Amino acid sequence: MIIYRQYQHEGAPVYEIITKTFQHVSIKCDDSFSDTEIFKLLSLLQDDIDHMKVS
């Protein structure tokens, strides 16, 4: 997973990632997440996205 962009939108952090299979995802989090929790969440989402079948 590559976090290639991080910015604030309406006060909340937004992370744009590229997964192992080169899919692009934007995730908006609230302020209650720590950096460690956000990284764990992004890692879980990456695995789910990489295993999804796109039709």
Swiss-Prot record:
InterPro entries: VraX. Pfam families: VraX (PF17412). It comes from the Bacteria. This is Protein VraX. It comes from Staphylococcus aureus (strain MRSA252).
